[in-house]
């Protein structure tokens, strides 16, 4: 039996993903005036596919979804199909700032949940004192 029952590890992984997303968003904002810079986005689809493949599923019909493994947990994708500025840059500062705020709220919620788990363990270890 694990002391943390996997919750701490899941929270740690979620914090790592939020950190990666934060870095990509701030990089986009920092390059708002860079000519021909294309905004990047973190895609966790590979991670979702990987986790889905761990599910045990029985395929009883050819139309059912196939579950398969993938190698990487995330990818950073540049969106090169648009340009918002004359210099070829496609960073939308309003969109980036919104995503930054959402990511910060998510990160803070994860940190608070992690603190709650540790406080619960502390209470158990000190006997509620």
UniProtKB/Swiss-Prot annotation:
Compartments (UniProt record): Bacterial flagellum basal body
Superkingdom of the organism of origin: Bacteria
InterPro entries hit by this protein: Flag_bb_rod_N (IPR001444), Flagellar_basal_body_rod_CS (IPR019776), FlgB (IPR006300)
Cellular component per GO, a single term: bacterial-type flagellum
Phenotype reported upon loss of the gene: Lack flagella. Altered cell surface properties including greater softness and lower density of the charged groups in the polymer layer.
GO biological process: bacterial-type flagellum assembly; bacterial-type flagellum-dependent swarming motility
Entry keyword set: Bacterial flagellum
Cited PANTHER family: FLAGELLAR BASAL BODY ROD PROTEIN FLGB, FLAGELLAR PROTEIN
Function: Structural component of flagellum, the bacterial motility apparatus. Part of the rod structure of flagellar basal body.
Similarity section: Belongs to the flagella basal body rod proteins family.
SUBUNIT field: The basal body constitutes a major portion of the flagellar organelle and consists of a number of rings mounted on a central rod. In Gram-negative bacteria, at least four rings, L, P, S and M are present, whereas Gram-positive bacteria lack the L and P rings. The rod consists of about 26 subunits of FlgG in the distal portion, and FlgB, FlgC and FlgF build up the proximal portion of the rod with about 6 subunits each.
Name of protein: Flagellar basal body rod protein FlgB
């Amino acid at each position: 039996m694990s002391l943390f029952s996997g919750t701490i590890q899941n929270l740690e992984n979620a914090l790592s993903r939020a950190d990666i997303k934060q870095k990509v968003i701030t990089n986009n904002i920092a390059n708002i005036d860079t000519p021909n810079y294309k905004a990047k986005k973190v895609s966790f689809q590979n991670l979702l596919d990987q986790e889905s493949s761990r599910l045990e599923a029985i395929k009883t019909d050819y139309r059912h979804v196939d579950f398969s493994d993938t190698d990487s947990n995330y990818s950073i994708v540049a969106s090169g199909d648009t340009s918002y500025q004359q210099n070829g840059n496609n960073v939308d500062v309003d969109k980036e700032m919104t995503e930054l705020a959402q990511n910060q709220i998510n990160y803070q919620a994860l940190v608070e949940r992690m603190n709650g788990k540790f406080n619960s363990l502390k209470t158990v270890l000190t006997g509620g004192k």
